[in-house]
A protein has these predicted regions:
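Short pre-catalytic strand/loop immediately N-terminal to key active-site residues, enriched for Gly-Thr
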Residues: 24, 109-113, 223-231
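Amphipathic alpha-helical repeat scaffolds
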Residues: 30, 113-120, 233-238
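Glycine/small-residue-rich loop that forms an oxyanion/phosphate-binding "nest" at active or ligand-binding sites
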Residues: 62-90
Length: 260
């Protein structure tokens, strides 16, 4: 495949949210991130741009491949020390309303604007075996280059669903059979390690570090106990605590149920 002026224009446009929306594509850069994409969703790959070094590191690359010099690759790379490989992929479509989630509970992100946190949460969620991640408007683009790099491409193995706000998210969750919403709070709420129904057909909402979770009438509040009396954890840290508390419960269940 040859690198044309049109292809170069597309590569540059995908650094912006507008460009991704207009084209329906995104960038996936780095050996591990593109490797996850190639393994999980090879049908999404439109083409790959790589240096000789990057192509050798990847081995088998699906679809069309364009080999470029290190200097030319640097024009498209968003990293200082690139690994010499990036793929252009179609943004996966969101699951339809006729495709209900299969997870025992749902993790939702409310107005989470930091791509590093968003990507880390995708990666952590993927490690637990869960498949759904919901988020509200005001959150970062899950397919921005920073979010994809932070996640190492994990979002391509997940079902991501976006909503206008928490209320519309709650309504759809209830239709799917997840009636209870837990809002995470750094200061008040039930202890997450003692909340027996926390992962029982529920929605656990993580908010932005600066603003927290939006208000939602009728939702329960749950907190991570912090004996050190620190202000708060960042969103990715908090999500990790909740996700691996879920893992702890399913791997060492109590005789009477999920809570041990």
């Amino acid at each position: 495949m040859e690198l044309t002026r049109k292809t170069e224009s597309l590569l540059r446009s995908l650094r912006t949210r507008h460009g991704r929306r207009k084209s329906g594509c995104c960038l996936c850069e780095g050996v591990r991130a593109t490797g996850e994409l190639f393994l999980r969703r090879p049908e999404l790959v439109r083409f790959t741009v790589a240096t000789e070094r990057g192509a050798a590191a990847m081995g088998n690359i699906p679809g069309e491949l364009c080999i470029v010099t290190e200097e030319k690759f640097a024009e498209f790379s968003a990293t200082v020390n690139s690994q010499g490989v990036l793929a252009v992929a179609s943004v996966p479509p969101e699951p339809g309303y006729d495709q209900p989630p299969r997870d025992p509970f749902l993790l939702a992100l409310d107005r989470l604007g930091d791509p590093g946190n968003f990507g880390t949460i995708c990666r952590t969620l993927r490690s637990t075996g869960l498949t759904e991640l919901w988020y509200t408007r005001g959150s970062v683009d899950p397919y921005g280059d920073k979010a994809v790099r932070s996640a190492l491409g994990a979002q391509f193995a997940l079902s991501l669903r976006s909503f206008e706000n928490l209320e519309t998210l709650r309504q759809q969750a209830a239709r799917f059979g997840y009636p209870t919403v837990y809002l995470t709070d750094p200061h008040t709420g039930e202890d997450c390690f003692r909340c027996s129904g926390l992962f029982d057909r529920s929605v656990v909402v993580i908010g932005a570090e600066a603003d927290g979770v939006s208000a939602l009438d009728g939702a329960a509040r749950v907190t991570i106990p912090m004996p050190g009396n620190y202000e708060s954890l960042n969103a990715a840290q908090a999500a990790t605590v909740f996700l691996f508390e879920y893992v702890r419960r399913i791997t060492a269940p109590a005789p009477g149920g999920i809570l041990s």
